[in-house]
């Protein structure tokens, strides 16, 4: 079987160096590649809110390092006072993106480490940094496992596939490698991929700007389409499978992901195409029985009526800008995790794995 190499071209959107964090500024891609220096927990919160860093797993990593920066800001040697201040910092970070459960998972993990550490504040801070490093390292390993299991879950026929994806789920959205795009990378490396169709993903265009950039950078053939073209492409038999990521998955498999995902799932079902969700188990919120309890972030209307400095719409009209929608589990063929690919009904069995 022919193989391709997309393995050694890694991107790391969150980087710790010299007691500060460096973030790839994803708002400037693809026209300009640059990093932003983050030196405080508040700066990290703003970076998450403004989507300098985005993607549920990457947000979790960034928030963990935001907690480390916050710990450096606290001026006390008393553990109780330190924990009180750290909790306030955690609350601020938790307010940034309400849908992405990895954010809350990482923050709670950091708080747990702080609470369970000994009384010395210096040791607590050291443990927090070590935990943030571990969260980052674990996510890379998790994404590679998702890529492996996703490759095995893909349809056996045709031998070479054309895959449609939505938003950006690659290295930029994770610690590195990616979830849904990680599966696509694995398929490309294994010689099973013809090309990727990338929805542009309005209103922020993460597919056109970020997924296309990642694929082109790695030599993976990619075709960008507008969101409204997806059904036509399926009807014309240009698509063999759909793979998306997730920001929060309920216990029954209902999945919140970038707005427009639900439409893709409905149309994929109508055309008898497999629809996969690729996400780490940290994205699964087992406390929610179904998707009705998932909070949906509402973002600024300017994201709809303006691109860059260009106004697209009359300003004397109303705008509605939910960042996510919820795809019912019944429309999902399989959920691909680091523990394997399962049906939505089987997801609950991975809770304690």
UniProtKB/Swiss-Prot annotation:
List residue numbers at the site (Transition state stabilizer): 167
List residues binding substrate: 54-56, 97, 206, 257-258
Q: Keywords, A to Z?
A: Amino-acid biosynthesis, Isomerase, Methionine biosynthesis
Reaction catalysed by this chain? 5-(methylsulfanyl)-alpha-D-ribose 1-phosphate = 5-(methylsulfanyl)-D-ribulose 1-phosphate
Per the UniProt record, which EC number(s) apply here?
A: 5.3.1.23
This protein's pathway reads: Amino-acid biosynthesis; L-methionine biosynthesis via salvage pathway; L-methionine from S-methyl-5-thio-alpha-D-ribose 1-phosphate: step 1/6
One MF term in GO for this entry? S-methyl-5-thioribose-1-phosphate isomerase activity
Entry annotated with the keyword Isomerase: yes
Any one Gene Ontology BP term: L-methionine salvage from methylthioadenosine
**Disulfide bridges in this chain:** none
In this protein, the active site sits at 247 (proton donor)
- NCBIfam families, per database record: eIF-2B_rel (TIGR00524), PRK05720.1 (NF004326), salvage_mtnA (TIGR00512)
Role according to the record = Catalyzes the interconversion of methylthioribose-1-phosphate (MTR-1-P) into methylthioribulose-1-phosphate (MTRu-1-P).
Q: Which family does it belong to?
A: Belongs to the eIF-2B alpha/beta/delta subunits family. MtnA subfamily.
Q: Supply the name of the protein.
A: Methylthioribose-1-phosphate isomerase
Q: Which organism is it from?
A: Microcystis aeruginosa
What is the gene name?
mtnA
């Amino acid at each position: 079987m022919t193989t391709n190499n997309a393995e050694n071209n890694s991107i790391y959107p969150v980087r710790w160096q010299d007691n500060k964090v460096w973030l790839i500024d994803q708002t400037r891609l693809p026209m300009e590649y640059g990093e932003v220096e983050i030196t405080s927990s508040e700066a990290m919160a703003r970076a998450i809110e403004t989507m300098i860093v985005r993607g549920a797993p990457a947000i979790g990593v960034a928030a963990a390092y935001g907690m480390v920066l916050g710990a450096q800001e606290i001026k006390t040697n008393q553990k109780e006072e330190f924990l009180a201040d750290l909790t306030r910092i955690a609350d601020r970070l938790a307010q940034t993106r309400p849908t992405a459960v990895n954010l809350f998972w990482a923050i709670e993990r950091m708080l747990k480490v702080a609470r369970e550490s000994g009384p010395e504040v210096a040791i607590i801070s050291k443990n927090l940094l070590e935990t943030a490093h571990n969260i980052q390292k674990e996510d890379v390993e998790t994404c590679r496992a998702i890529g492996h299991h996703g490759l095995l879950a893909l349809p056996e026929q045709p031998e070479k596939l054309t895959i449609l994806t939505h938003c950006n789920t690659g290295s930029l959205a994770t610690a590195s490698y990616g979830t849904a795009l990680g599966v696509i990378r694995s398929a490309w490396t294994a010689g099973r991929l013809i090309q990727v169709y990338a929805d542009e993903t309005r209103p922020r265009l993460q597919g056109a700007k970020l997924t296309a950039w990642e694929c082109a950078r790695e030599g993976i053939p990619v075709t960008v389409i507008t969101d409204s073209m997806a059904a036509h492409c399926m009807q014309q038999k240009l698509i063999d499978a759909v793979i998306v990521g997730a920001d929060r998955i309920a216990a029954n498999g209902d999945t919140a992901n970038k707005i427009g995902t639900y439409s893709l799932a409905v149309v994929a079902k109508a055309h008898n195409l497999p629809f996969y969700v690729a996400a780490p188990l940290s994205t699964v919120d087992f406390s929610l029985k179904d998707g009705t309890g998932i909070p949906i972030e509402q973002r600024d209307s300017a994201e709809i009526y303006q691109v860059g400095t260009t106004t697209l719409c009359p300003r004397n009209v109303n705008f509605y800008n939910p960042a996510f929608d919820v795809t019912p589990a019944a429309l999902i063929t399989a959920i691909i995790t680091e523990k394997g690919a399962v049906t939505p009904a089987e997801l609950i069995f991975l809770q304690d794995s």
